[in-house]
Amino acid sequence: MSSQISRSVGRWEKGASNLQPDVEIVQRLLETAAHALQAPELDPKGVDGKIAQVSAKSNTVAAIEAFQSRSNISIDGLIEPDSQTWQALMQAAGGT
């Protein structure tokens, strides 16, 4: 699995690109972090490479926001390459 995203993932209304390969990477990392931290609220409920257009219905956006809250990061529902959220997620999932 690649350990980097090329564009932003998360809330469409925040301008996220949500490219399928990037979304899949984030979803897999969230799954891994949910298991490692024993935090089911971080589980995006599947890896399909998609973000619901209505963020309130997106399990992935909910998982991103739960991760940001747990990590004391500003909650915006967005993960950008090399952002604080990305770095924390990589660490939580055991990535580099």
Where are these regions (language model features)?
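Cell-envelope/ECM-targeting effectors and their regulatory/trafficking segments
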Residues: 1-96
